[in-house]
Amino acid sequence: AGEAPVLAQMQIGMLGIFADADQLVDLQKFVDEENYDMSDFMPGLLDASYYDGALVALPHSRSVPVLYYNKDRFKEAGLEEAPVTWDDLKADAKALTGNGSYGYSCPLDQWYYMSLVMNAGGTIFNETEDGIGFAGDPGTKPLYLWKEMIADGTMHVPSGQDYNSSEACRNAFAGGTAAMIQQSSAQLKGLEKTCEFEVGVGAVPQDTTLSYPAGGSNLLMFKGHSEEEEKAGWEFLKYMTNTENAVR
């Protein structure tokens, strides 16, 4: 107690709190010392590892919202591809609803809501980062989309909150009572193991823009440790984020 570890895996939403408190090591010094190649990191994920110009983390265990769909049910309904637009989503969900099954299921969760907000042209913060970026249509259109689909009986709202709601959503998919679900890309392997049908993966349908809020966690290094510990920590960070380990 009272002593931070050398390294930690941290949810990206918490990164700024510790960086603002000057608790994190700027990893750029290690990158510069050995001319470490950073090109293998996806730019969009790497951007979320910087705070006020300092490289305070490396991407690890990152994910984005995706649309999973039951390929068998799609074939039975005469559908060939995952829906691309919100209109496609509504039409496909209607075609897939019936016999005790909903066409679509999604937790009423802020992360999945924000994915629809961004696909409607909104952002979490405005350009000056002193207010929200989803006032007006980008913020309300996703809610009206959900409201319409729930009223039409084509959208299942899983019970519970947070992770419980997501688990209920995945159970509905695996059990055949939801043909499409919006979940994290991190759930792919688990769904492939539990579902007795072929699982398809598509982008979250868009309204005006194809854009998503990346989630997951980063690896970081805390200040307050010896030079030897920092160097050992850097070696472990490289090991954990190299291509071979990242794709496992």
Predicted features, each with a name:
Residues 2-10, 23-25, 99-102, 174-183, ...:
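Alpha-to-beta junction loops
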Residues 12-66, 75, 84, 88-92, ...:
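Hinge/lid segment of periplasmic solute-binding proteins
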Residues 15-19, 182-197:
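A ligand-binding cleft/hinge motif common to bilobed small-molecule-binding domains
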Residues 1-22, 31-39, 53, 81, ...:
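Conserved N-terminal structural module of periplasmic/extracytoplasmic solute-binding proteins
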Residues 28-41, 122-143, 193-194, 206-212:
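Short, solvent-exposed loop/beta-turn-alpha elements that line the ligand-binding surface or hinge
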Residues 76-77, 152-155, 192-248:
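Extracytoplasmic/periplasmic substrate-recognition and gating elements
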Residues 92-96, 131-161:
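Glycine-centered hinge/linker elements that transmit conformational signals in sensory
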Residues 1, 13, 84-90, 159-174:
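Short helix-initiation/N-cap motifs at beta->coil->alpha
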